[in-house]
Amino acid sequence: MKINGQSVSRETQERLEHFVELFKKWNKTTNLVAPSTLTELWSRHVADSAQIFQLSPQPKKWIDLGSGGGFPGVITAIFLAELGDGWVDLVESNNKKAAFLRIALKETGARGAVHPVRIETASEIITTCNAVSARALADLDLLFGYIHPWAQNNPNLKAYFNKGRDYDSEVQKAHGRWQFDLIKHRSAIEADSVVLEISNLVLRR
């Protein structure tokens, strides 16, 4: 099996397939994604999420914000399971979605834990990390506010955000309050989309 042109082991493929089946089952009663996108689970959600880990397999301690249906957090945790190392802390304040995430992690053997708290208070519980991810959550300025506590604790922190075609306007807006280094990775899924890699985040004084 290949995802985004990269080979995936049989073990990881089986974990991903089990996650997708769980997702379909839970989506009938818990609104994880729009029903209209269920036919594109692999191409639109799994593969899009897998880009995060494929771009940066080195970080061993991740935080995924607004994890929702597990994209990209559970997908990253599944890839880490193959390595037998690393961890993803998934932050999701919706109790139903948090319950799904717990079951997904347990049944796939993925390496992670779920924290049913608001993002604004997550840094009080999870004090350190190497990398942060978020998908379809908020604009960059707000995301930077969320991750700033971890950036202060770890100058080497990297963040990875899936963004659509309007990302340039978000970048310009964020420059008003923040200094940061930016690498734009073209999405392997959608021509107009990117994965933004953020480092050296500092609040302007």
Swiss-Prot record:
Its EC number is 2.1.1.170. It catalyses: guanosine(527) in 16S rRNA + S-adenosyl-L-methionine = N(7)-methylguanosine(527) in 16S rRNA + S-adenosyl-L-homocysteine. The keyword Transferase applies. It is found in: Cytoplasm. Transmembrane segments: none annotated. GO terms for molecular function: rRNA (guanine-N7-)-methyltransferase activity. Keywords: Cytoplasm, Methyltransferase, rRNA processing, S-adenosyl-L-methionine, Transferase. One of its GO terms (cellular component) is cytosol. This is Ribosomal RNA small subunit methyltransferase G. Specifically methylates the N7 position of guanine in position 527 of 16S rRNA. S-adenosyl-L-methionine binds at residues 66, 71, 119-120, 135. It holds the Pfam family GidB. Gene3D superfamilies: Vaccinia Virus protein VP39. It comes from the Bacteria.
